[in-house]
A protein has these predicted regions:
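STAS-like cytosolic regulatory interaction modules
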Residues: 1-56, 61, 67-110
Length: 110
């Protein structure tokens, strides 16, 4: 995967940050997602949602970033969730690792 195909965006409204992700999350791109989540979790909001509607692939490094962010959110009293998982391979990752519930994975829009 080419890193330039990977995008992370951010929007904020009413005490909530939505991190939008597009492309493939792997060892090369996971640090960019980690940085975006770190910023979101330290800006004083009550809720952080990660919109996965544009994510085509996520490996264990991406999963690790999400689990780390979830732990940070819990410690800070911030609600954390992953929304709009569209790619079957990503849904399988959450299912096989039994992390969907812990990550607050939902099919609804962020």
């Amino acid at each position: 995967m080419r890193d330039q195909d990977f995008r992370v965006g951010r929007r904020e409204d009413a005490g909530r940050v939505v991190i939008t992700v597009a492309g493939e999350i792997d060892l090369g791109t996971a640090p960019r997602l980690r940085d975006a989540l770190d910023d979101a979790l330290t800006c004083g909001v009550h809720r952080v949602e990660v919109d996965f509607s544009g994510v085509r692939f996520c490996d264990c490094s991406g999963l690790g970033v999400l689990l780390r962010a979830r732990a940070q959110a819990r410690d800070a009293g911030v609600v954390f969730g992953v929304a709009q998982v569209q790619a079957p391979v990503v849904g399988r990752l959450f299912h096989l690792t039994q992390t969907a519930s812990a990550l607050g994975v939902s099919g609804r829009a962020a």
